[in-house]
A protein has these predicted regions:
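Gly/Pro-rich active-site loop or hairpin
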Residues: 41-49, 142, 177-181, 201-277, ...
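Active-site acidic/histidine proton-transfer and metal-coordination neighborhood
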Residues: 17, 61-65, 78-192
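Catalytic domains of carbohydrate-active enzymes, especially glycoside hydrolases
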Residues: 16-38, 102-103
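Conserved, mostly hydrophobic/aromatic
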Residues: 5, 22, 30, 62, ...
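Acidic (Asp/Glu)-rich catalytic clusters
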Residues: 19-24, 48-70, 94-103, 150-159, ...
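Active-site beta-loop-alpha junctions enriched in small/polar residues
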Residues: 6-10, 33-37, 74-77, 112-114, ...
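Glycine-rich, proline-tolerant flexible connector loops at the mouths of alpha/beta enzymes
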Residues: 33-57, 114-118
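C-terminal helical cap(s) of enzyme catalytic domains, especially alpha/beta-barrels
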Residues: 293-309
Length: 309
Protein backbone atom coordinates (compact mmCIF):
# COMPACT_ATOMS: atom_id res chain seq x y z
CA UNK A 1 0.00 0.00 0.00
CA UNK A 2 1.00 3.62 -0.50
CA UNK A 3 0.60 6.56 1.86
CA UNK A 4 -1.32 9.44 0.34
CA UNK A 5 -3.02 12.65 1.43
CA UNK A 6 -5.84 14.87 0.30
CA UNK A 7 -4.08 18.21 -0.01
CA UNK A 8 -6.91 20.10 1.73
CA UNK A 9 -5.37 18.61 4.88
CA UNK A 10 -2.63 21.22 4.44
CA UNK A 11 -4.84 23.75 2.72
CA UNK A 12 -3.10 26.73 4.28
CA UNK A 13 0.08 25.88 2.37
CA UNK A 14 0.82 26.84 -1.21
CA UNK A 15 0.88 24.22 -3.95
CA UNK A 16 4.68 24.15 -3.98
CA UNK A 17 4.90 23.97 -0.20
CA UNK A 18 2.39 21.11 -0.09
CA UNK A 19 4.51 19.17 -2.57
CA UNK A 20 7.68 19.81 -0.58
CA UNK A 21 6.03 18.91 2.72
CA UNK A 22 4.39 15.75 1.41
CA UNK A 23 7.60 14.50 -0.14
CA UNK A 24 9.51 15.30 3.03
CA UNK A 25 7.05 13.29 5.13
CA UNK A 26 7.34 10.26 2.85
CA UNK A 27 3.90 10.64 1.30
CA UNK A 28 3.74 9.09 -2.16
CA UNK A 29 0.36 10.08 -3.63
CA UNK A 30 -1.79 13.20 -3.50
CA UNK A 31 -5.53 13.72 -3.92
CA UNK A 32 -6.50 17.19 -5.11
CA UNK A 33 -9.86 18.80 -4.38
CA UNK A 34 -11.30 20.83 -7.23
CA UNK A 35 -14.23 22.63 -5.60
CA UNK A 36 -17.77 22.31 -4.24
CA UNK A 37 -17.34 21.88 -0.47
CA UNK A 38 -13.62 22.48 -0.83
CA UNK A 39 -12.17 25.89 -1.56
CA UNK A 40 -9.80 24.06 -3.95
CA UNK A 41 -6.67 25.69 -2.53
CA UNK A 42 -4.32 23.95 -4.96
CA UNK A 43 -6.34 23.60 -8.18
CA UNK A 44 -7.48 26.44 -10.45
CA UNK A 45 -10.21 24.36 -12.08
CA UNK A 46 -11.31 26.67 -14.88
CA UNK A 47 -7.78 27.65 -15.86
CA UNK A 48 -6.56 24.06 -15.90
CA UNK A 49 -9.49 23.00 -18.05
CA UNK A 50 -8.61 25.69 -20.57
CA UNK A 51 -4.82 25.35 -20.61
CA UNK A 52 -2.93 22.21 -21.59
CA UNK A 53 0.27 24.00 -20.57
CA UNK A 54 -1.07 24.54 -17.05
CA UNK A 55 -2.07 20.89 -16.80
CA UNK A 56 1.33 19.71 -17.97
CA UNK A 57 3.09 22.05 -15.56
CA UNK A 58 0.92 20.88 -12.65
CA UNK A 59 1.61 17.19 -13.30
CA UNK A 60 5.30 17.89 -13.88
CA UNK A 61 5.69 19.66 -10.53
CA UNK A 62 3.99 16.74 -8.77
CA UNK A 63 6.33 14.27 -10.49
CA UNK A 64 9.38 16.44 -9.78
CA UNK A 65 8.79 15.78 -6.08
CA UNK A 66 8.51 12.02 -6.58
CA UNK A 67 4.73 12.09 -6.14
CA UNK A 68 1.77 10.88 -8.17
CA UNK A 69 -1.90 11.87 -8.24
CA UNK A 70 -4.25 9.31 -6.70
CA UNK A 71 -7.51 11.11 -7.50
CA UNK A 72 -9.31 14.38 -8.01
CA UNK A 73 -12.05 15.24 -5.52
CA UNK A 74 -15.27 17.20 -6.08
CA UNK A 75 -17.31 16.25 -3.01
CA UNK A 76 -20.53 18.24 -2.88
CA UNK A 77 -24.26 17.86 -3.41
CA UNK A 78 -25.01 17.92 -7.14
CA UNK A 79 -28.63 16.84 -6.53
CA UNK A 80 -29.44 19.60 -4.05
CA UNK A 81 -32.63 21.41 -5.10
CA UNK A 82 -32.32 24.56 -7.16
CA UNK A 83 -29.28 26.59 -8.12
CA UNK A 84 -27.13 25.10 -5.36
CA UNK A 85 -27.32 21.67 -6.97
CA UNK A 86 -26.73 23.08 -10.44
CA UNK A 87 -23.52 24.78 -9.30
CA UNK A 88 -22.26 21.60 -7.66
CA UNK A 89 -23.18 19.53 -10.70
CA UNK A 90 -21.21 21.90 -12.92
CA UNK A 91 -18.08 21.54 -10.75
CA UNK A 92 -18.60 17.78 -10.65
CA UNK A 93 -18.66 17.53 -14.43
CA UNK A 94 -15.73 19.92 -14.82
CA UNK A 95 -13.71 17.82 -12.37
CA UNK A 96 -14.48 14.63 -14.29
CA UNK A 97 -13.45 16.37 -17.51
CA UNK A 98 -10.21 17.57 -15.89
CA UNK A 99 -9.48 14.04 -14.67
CA UNK A 100 -9.91 12.83 -18.24
CA UNK A 101 -7.58 15.49 -19.62
CA UNK A 102 -4.94 14.74 -16.96
CA UNK A 103 -5.13 10.97 -17.27
CA UNK A 104 -6.37 10.57 -13.68
CA UNK A 105 -8.59 7.51 -13.44
CA UNK A 106 -10.38 8.22 -10.13
CA UNK A 107 -12.71 11.00 -9.00
CA UNK A 108 -13.73 11.06 -5.33
CA UNK A 109 -17.15 12.46 -4.55
CA UNK A 110 -20.40 11.88 -2.69
CA UNK A 111 -23.77 10.70 -3.89
CA UNK A 112 -25.60 13.86 -2.92
CA UNK A 113 -28.93 14.16 -1.14
CA UNK A 114 -32.03 15.69 -2.76
CA UNK A 115 -34.92 17.29 -0.95
CA UNK A 116 -38.45 16.00 -0.98
CA UNK A 117 -40.92 17.02 -3.69
CA UNK A 118 -40.97 20.82 -3.82
CA UNK A 119 -38.30 21.25 -1.13
CA UNK A 120 -35.77 24.08 -1.23
CA UNK A 121 -33.12 22.21 0.77
CA UNK A 122 -31.67 18.72 1.00
CA UNK A 123 -33.44 16.30 3.35
CA UNK A 124 -31.52 13.33 4.76
CA UNK A 125 -34.14 10.78 5.82
CA UNK A 126 -32.92 8.49 8.61
CA UNK A 127 -36.20 6.95 9.85
CA UNK A 128 -39.16 5.18 8.26
CA UNK A 129 -41.74 7.19 10.23
CA UNK A 130 -43.86 9.22 9.83
CA UNK A 131 -45.24 7.85 6.59
CA UNK A 132 -44.19 10.82 4.48
CA UNK A 133 -40.57 9.78 5.02
CA UNK A 134 -41.16 6.84 2.69
CA UNK A 135 -42.69 9.16 0.11
CA UNK A 136 -39.65 11.44 0.30
CA UNK A 137 -37.23 8.51 -0.04
CA UNK A 138 -39.07 7.07 -3.02
CA UNK A 139 -38.97 10.46 -4.73
CA UNK A 140 -35.31 10.99 -3.93
CA UNK A 141 -34.18 7.63 -5.24
CA UNK A 142 -36.53 7.09 -8.16
CA UNK A 143 -37.08 10.60 -9.49
CA UNK A 144 -33.77 12.32 -8.72
CA UNK A 145 -30.78 10.28 -7.55
CA UNK A 146 -30.87 7.24 -9.83
CA UNK A 147 -31.60 9.20 -13.04
CA UNK A 148 -28.89 11.72 -12.13
CA UNK A 149 -26.28 9.04 -11.57
CA UNK A 150 -27.16 7.13 -14.73
CA UNK A 151 -26.55 10.32 -16.67
CA UNK A 152 -23.33 11.15 -14.78
CA UNK A 153 -21.94 7.66 -15.33
CA UNK A 154 -22.62 7.99 -19.06
CA UNK A 155 -20.91 11.39 -19.05
CA UNK A 156 -17.84 10.04 -17.23
CA UNK A 157 -17.60 6.97 -19.45
CA UNK A 158 -17.80 9.17 -22.52
CA UNK A 159 -14.67 10.92 -21.27
CA UNK A 160 -12.92 7.66 -20.42
CA UNK A 161 -13.27 8.05 -16.63
CA UNK A 162 -14.28 4.67 -15.19
CA UNK A 163 -14.01 5.11 -11.42
CA UNK A 164 -16.34 7.47 -9.57
CA UNK A 165 -15.52 6.85 -5.91
CA UNK A 166 -18.40 7.60 -3.54
CA UNK A 167 -17.66 8.38 0.09
CA UNK A 168 -20.21 6.77 2.42
CA UNK A 169 -21.06 9.86 4.47
CA UNK A 170 -23.83 11.29 6.60
CA UNK A 171 -26.36 13.58 4.90
CA UNK A 172 -25.99 11.60 1.68
CA UNK A 173 -28.40 9.09 0.19
CA UNK A 174 -25.46 6.71 -0.20
CA UNK A 175 -24.16 6.51 3.36
CA UNK A 176 -23.95 2.76 4.05
CA UNK A 177 -23.05 -0.54 2.43
CA UNK A 178 -26.70 -1.23 1.67
CA UNK A 179 -27.39 2.15 0.07
CA UNK A 180 -24.18 1.92 -1.94
CA UNK A 181 -25.23 -1.40 -3.48
CA UNK A 182 -28.66 0.02 -4.26
CA UNK A 183 -27.11 2.74 -6.41
CA UNK A 184 -24.35 0.56 -7.86
CA UNK A 185 -26.83 -2.11 -8.94
CA UNK A 186 -28.89 0.58 -10.66
CA UNK A 187 -26.11 2.42 -12.51
CA UNK A 188 -23.21 0.01 -12.94
CA UNK A 189 -19.60 -0.58 -11.95
CA UNK A 190 -18.28 2.87 -12.77
CA UNK A 191 -19.59 3.74 -9.31
CA UNK A 192 -17.39 2.40 -6.52
CA UNK A 193 -16.47 3.43 -3.00
CA UNK A 194 -14.01 5.89 -1.54
CA UNK A 195 -13.78 3.98 1.72
CA UNK A 196 -13.51 6.31 4.71
CA UNK A 197 -13.93 4.37 7.95
CA UNK A 198 -14.43 7.46 10.10
CA UNK A 199 -18.02 8.05 8.99
CA UNK A 200 -19.04 4.44 9.49
CA UNK A 201 -17.60 4.63 13.02
CA UNK A 202 -19.86 7.46 14.16
CA UNK A 203 -22.88 5.97 12.40
CA UNK A 204 -22.39 2.75 14.37
CA UNK A 205 -21.27 0.44 11.55
CA UNK A 206 -18.21 -1.82 11.65
CA UNK A 207 -15.73 -0.67 8.98
CA UNK A 208 -13.98 -4.04 8.94
CA UNK A 209 -17.23 -5.85 8.13
CA UNK A 210 -18.02 -3.18 5.55
CA UNK A 211 -14.72 -3.81 3.76
CA UNK A 212 -15.57 -7.49 3.47
CA UNK A 213 -19.03 -6.69 2.11
CA UNK A 214 -17.76 -4.16 -0.45
CA UNK A 215 -14.81 -6.18 -1.76
CA UNK A 216 -13.53 -5.06 -5.13
CA UNK A 217 -16.02 -2.18 -5.22
CA UNK A 218 -13.51 -0.25 -3.08
CA UNK A 219 -11.70 2.04 -5.53
CA UNK A 220 -9.97 4.52 -3.19
CA UNK A 221 -9.46 4.86 0.58
CA UNK A 222 -9.36 7.76 3.01
CA UNK A 223 -7.37 7.32 6.21
CA UNK A 224 -9.25 9.16 8.95
CA UNK A 225 -10.19 8.21 12.50
CA UNK A 226 -13.15 8.95 14.78
CA UNK A 227 -13.23 9.04 18.55
CA UNK A 228 -16.53 8.45 20.33
CA UNK A 229 -17.09 10.45 23.52
CA UNK A 230 -18.77 7.79 25.70
CA UNK A 231 -20.22 10.29 28.17
CA UNK A 232 -21.98 12.46 25.60
CA UNK A 233 -22.88 9.59 23.29
CA UNK A 234 -24.22 7.60 26.23
CA UNK A 235 -26.61 10.42 27.10
CA UNK A 236 -27.59 11.74 23.68
CA UNK A 237 -26.67 9.11 21.10
CA UNK A 238 -24.39 9.81 18.16
CA UNK A 239 -26.53 12.13 16.05
CA UNK A 240 -24.89 15.43 16.90
CA UNK A 241 -25.14 18.86 15.30
CA UNK A 242 -22.85 20.76 17.68
CA UNK A 243 -19.94 22.60 16.08
CA UNK A 244 -16.75 20.69 15.32
CA UNK A 245 -14.86 23.53 17.00
CA UNK A 246 -16.25 22.42 20.40
CA UNK A 247 -15.07 18.79 20.43
CA UNK A 248 -15.50 18.29 24.19
CA UNK A 249 -19.25 18.88 23.82
CA UNK A 250 -19.75 16.43 20.98
CA UNK A 251 -20.66 12.73 20.93
CA UNK A 252 -17.93 12.04 18.38
CA UNK A 253 -15.09 13.82 16.62
CA UNK A 254 -12.82 13.22 13.66
CA UNK A 255 -9.31 12.69 14.99
CA UNK A 256 -5.79 11.89 13.87
CA UNK A 257 -5.07 8.23 13.16
CA UNK A 258 -4.51 6.34 16.40
CA UNK A 259 -6.44 8.81 18.59
CA UNK A 260 -9.70 6.98 18.06
CA UNK A 261 -8.74 3.42 17.15
CA UNK A 262 -5.46 1.97 18.37
CA UNK A 263 -2.63 0.94 16.06
CA UNK A 264 -3.67 -2.73 16.22
CA UNK A 265 -7.05 -1.78 14.74
CA UNK A 266 -5.39 -0.01 11.85
CA UNK A 267 -3.28 -3.11 11.18
CA UNK A 268 -6.50 -5.11 10.91
CA UNK A 269 -7.95 -2.40 8.66
CA UNK A 270 -5.06 -2.74 6.21
CA UNK A 271 -5.19 -6.52 6.39
CA UNK A 272 -8.92 -6.51 5.58
CA UNK A 273 -8.33 -4.19 2.63
CA UNK A 274 -5.65 -6.50 1.24
CA UNK A 275 -7.92 -9.51 1.70
CA UNK A 276 -10.59 -7.64 -0.26
CA UNK A 277 -8.09 -7.11 -3.09
CA UNK A 278 -7.23 -3.48 -2.35
CA UNK A 279 -3.51 -2.70 -2.27
CA UNK A 280 -3.42 0.96 -3.20
CA UNK A 281 -3.42 4.43 -1.67
CA UNK A 282 -4.43 5.31 1.91
CA UNK A 283 -5.19 9.02 1.55
CA UNK A 284 -4.83 10.88 4.87
CA UNK A 285 -7.55 13.43 5.58
CA UNK A 286 -6.81 15.69 8.55
CA UNK A 287 -9.84 17.12 10.39
CA UNK A 288 -8.63 16.89 14.00
CA UNK A 289 -9.51 20.10 15.87
CA UNK A 290 -7.00 19.34 18.63
CA UNK A 291 -3.85 19.17 16.49
CA UNK A 292 -2.34 21.44 13.89
CA UNK A 293 -2.66 20.14 10.33
CA UNK A 294 1.05 19.43 9.97
CA UNK A 295 1.24 17.68 13.34
CA UNK A 296 -1.83 15.58 12.59
CA UNK A 297 -0.65 14.59 9.13
CA UNK A 298 2.83 13.76 10.43
CA UNK A 299 1.42 11.53 13.18
CA UNK A 300 -0.87 9.80 10.67
CA UNK A 301 2.03 9.14 8.31
CA UNK A 302 4.04 7.57 11.12
CA UNK A 303 1.18 5.27 12.10
CA UNK A 304 0.49 4.20 8.52
CA UNK A 305 4.16 3.51 7.93
CA UNK A 306 4.07 1.08 10.86
CA UNK A 307 0.85 -0.71 9.96
CA UNK A 308 1.53 -1.22 6.24
CA UNK A 309 5.09 -2.46 6.76
Amino acid sequence: MKIGMITDSLGELSFEKVLETAAGLGIEMLEFACGNWSSAPHVALSRMLESADDRRAFVARVKDHGLTISALNCSGNPVHPGEHGKRHDAVTRQTIKLASLMGVDRVVMMSGCPGGPGDANANWVVTNWPAEMRTILDYQWNDVLTPYWRDLVAYANGLGVRKLCLELHGHQNVYSVETFWRLRNAVGETVGVNFDPSHLMWMGADPLKAIEALGDAIYHVHAKDTRINPTVAGLNGRLDHKAAATPADRAWNYVTLGRGQEEVWWRRFCAELRTAGYDDVLSIEHEDQALSPLDGVSKSVRLLREVIA
